[in-house]
């Protein structure tokens, strides 16, 4: 069993404060819970198990048992998980506050050891010091933490995590915060705690302490679309569906600038109990709009591209071509339920076909040209430096003509009305007959930016904001977008 979970279970009986703070879903009666998806460490009870999604941030970081309390490390309410969470720069003072909280909630002294020993020995055949019976006394104070970067903020979720070598399918990674503190001071704290234990337990305590305090930090992981659950969406089949978020709050709103001070609240039990008794939940509906989700969607589109359309003479738009084995697109994928992606695909293929027809003699769907290899990549605009490469390849294929030291290509083939409008909008109110490289880039990017302007998008979804940030955006009515009205970014 998880050491941290066991410690919470046994220490919860000590006093009123512990009974309130150390209440874990993993130690309570099991309730029906969502299915699990990934393996990793539950941030609430610190055990390595199968994880399900959090209703506060949509990340997979909570086990089936703890999910019943809907706790998130981004909450405002200073529950145990929130008090173990630190943000950005951790000072030595912040670490001292964390260690003091550990000492307050999980003390080890002669009186307590005797109390726990007597309790264990009340059971039959328990005169020996078997580790599984005293697991709660074998939790050393360490500076282990799981860390994740959300937008411009780095979060450290401290705790005692067993089985660090086990499989980790989450975006959180282990970091050793002992580098920010004095090793000798931490050693002294633990040796003092260890001195009250029987000899056989001291050996196990020391082994656990050194293995969990002398490890190398892991490299930071990058978030991906699959790290976020779809289960919080109002309608999973709608590409513009809002995400439902639940956050635990308190009546006296805490300032984000004092985020790292939450762990010091347990020093004053009466005040802490009053704060917790004022807790309530806030519900938010937030937009999916972010680079992470957009990159994922455009990546799927790029894999479904049928480049041969740009050599064809079909009268219909790219997605409406039927009975042509070279140009017909598979319309059964879920991604095509998004009208924005349909418009982007049709307009992009229409414009590239106009360029190809204006500058070459290719006129059949089955043509095998080198240009087709770069077409899928022109949809991957989220990383502009990489995107410039396939655009240059496309431009070179069009065999531009040098005019006064600058290269131009023709644009004299018919384009649809939407593309024409975008060209007029981005080319000073006209449709030019010749285009240079920058003009081609501007028009290609405008077709995507019309609906997904990644230049002004957050990297991660709004679900990763703190509760105070969500509250502030909600007051300004900026948590949702207007895509349900089919209004583009430009409009």
UniProtKB/Swiss-Prot annotation:
Q: Biological process GO terms, please?
A: symbiont-mediated suppression of host cytoplasmic pattern recognition receptor signaling pathway via inhibition of IRF3 activity; symbiont-mediated suppression of host cytoplasmic pattern recognition receptor signaling pathway via inhibition of IRF7 activity
> Membrane among the record's keywords?
no
Molecular function GO labels: metal ion binding; RNA binding
Instruction: Give me the ranges of the annotated region Important for cytoskeleton localization.
Output: 82-176
Which Pfam families does the protein's record reference? Rota_NS53 (PF00981)
Q: Where is this region: RNA-binding?
A: 1-81
Residues covered by region (Zinc-binding domain)? 42-79
Record localization: Host cytoplasm, Host cytoskeleton
Which terms are listed as keywords in the entry? Host cytoplasm, Host cytoskeleton, Host-virus interaction, Inhibition of host innate immune response by virus, Inhibition of host IRF3 by virus, Inhibition of host IRF7 by virus, Inhibition of host RLR pathway by virus, Interferon antiviral system evasion, Metal-binding, RNA-binding, Viral immunoevasion
GO CC, sorted alphabetically, is: host cell cytoplasm; host cytoskeleton
Place the motif pLxIS motif on the sequence.
Answer: 485-488
**Region called Interaction with host IRF3, residue ranges:** 320-491
Q: Which domain of life is it from?
A: Viruses
Assembly information from the UniProt record: Interacts (via C-terminus) with host IRF3; this interaction leads to IRF3 degradation. Interacts with host IRF7; this interaction leads to IRF7 degradation. Interacts with host CUL1 and CUL3.
Sum up the protein's function in the record's words.
Plays a role in the inhibition of host innate immunity by inducing the degradation of key host factors required to activate interferon production such as IRF3, IRF5 or IRF7. Associates with components of cullin RING ligases (CRLs) including CUL1 or CUL3, which are essential multisubunit ubiquitination complexes, to modulate their activities.
Q: Matching HAMAP family, A to Z?
A: ROTA_NSP1 (MF_04088)
Query: What free text does the record give on domains?
Result: The integrity of the zinc-binding domain in NSP1 is important for degradation of host IRF3.
What is the name of this protein? Non-structural protein 1
What organism does the UniProt record list as the source? Rotavirus A (strain RVA/Human/Japan/AU-1/1982/G3P3[9])
Q: What is the lineage of its organism?
A: Viruses, Riboviria, Orthornavirae, Duplornaviricota, Resentoviricetes
């Amino acid at each position: 069993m998880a050491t941290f979970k066991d410690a919470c279970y046994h220490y919860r009986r000590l006093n009123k404060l512990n009974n309130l703070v150390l209440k874990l879903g993993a130690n309570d009666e099991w309730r029906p819970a969502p299915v699990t998806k990934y393996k990793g460490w539950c941030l609430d009870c610190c055990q390595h198990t199968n994880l399900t999604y959090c209703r506060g941030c949509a990340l997979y970081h909570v086990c089936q048992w703890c999910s019943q309390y809907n706790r998130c490390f981004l909450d405002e309410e200073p529950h145990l998980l929130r008090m173990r969470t630190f943000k950005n720069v951790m000072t030595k003072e912040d670490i001292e506050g964390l260690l003091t909280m550990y000492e307050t909630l999980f003390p080890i002294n002669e009186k307590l050891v005797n109390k726990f020993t007597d309790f264990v020995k009340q059971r039959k055949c328990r005169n020996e010091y078997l580790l599984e019976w005293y697991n709660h006394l074998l939790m050393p104070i360490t500076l282990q933490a799981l860390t994740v970067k959300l937008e411009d903020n780095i979060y450290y979720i401290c705790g005692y995590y067993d089985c660090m070598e086990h499989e980790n399918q989450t975006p959180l990674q282990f970091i050793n915060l002992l580098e920010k503190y004095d090793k000798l001071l931490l050693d002294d704290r633990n040796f003092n705690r260890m001195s009250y234990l029987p000899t056989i337990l001291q050996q196990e305590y020391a082994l656990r302490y050194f293995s969990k305090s002398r490890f190398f930090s892991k490299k930071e992981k990058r978030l991906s679309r699959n790290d976020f659950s779809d289960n919080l969406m109002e309608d999973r089949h709608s590409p513009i569906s809002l995400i439902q978020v639940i956050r635990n709050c308190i009546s006296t709103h805490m300032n984000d600038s004092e985020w790292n001070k939450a762990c010091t609240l347990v020093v004053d039990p009466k005040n802490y109990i009053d704060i917790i008794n004022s807790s309530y939940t806030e519900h938010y509906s937030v937009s999916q709009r972010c680079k992470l989700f957009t990159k994922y969607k455009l990546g799927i589109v790029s894999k479904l591209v049928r480049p041969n359309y740009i050599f064809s003479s079909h009268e219909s738009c790219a997605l409406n071509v039927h009975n042509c084995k070279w140009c017909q697109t598979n319309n059964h994928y879920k991604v095509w339920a998004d009208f924005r992606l349909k418009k982007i695909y049709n307009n992009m293929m229409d414009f590239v076909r106009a360029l190809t027809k204006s500058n070459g003699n290719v006129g059949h769907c089955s043509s095998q040209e080198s240009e087709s290899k770069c077409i899928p990549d022109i949809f991957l605009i989220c990383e502009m430096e990489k995107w410039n490469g396939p655009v240059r390849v496309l431009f070179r294929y069009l065999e531009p003509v040098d005019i006064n030291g600058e290269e131009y290509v023709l644009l004299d083939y018919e384009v649809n009305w939407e593309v024409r409008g975008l060209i007029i909008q981005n080319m000073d109110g006209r449709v030019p007959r010749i285009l240079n490289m920058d003009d081609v880039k501007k028009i290609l990017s405008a077709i995507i930016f019309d609906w997904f302007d990644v230049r002004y998008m957050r990297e991660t979804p709004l679900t990763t904001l703190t509760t105070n940030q969500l509250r502030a955006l909600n007051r300004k009515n900026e948590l949702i977008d207007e895509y349900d009205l089919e209004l583009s970014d430009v409009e």
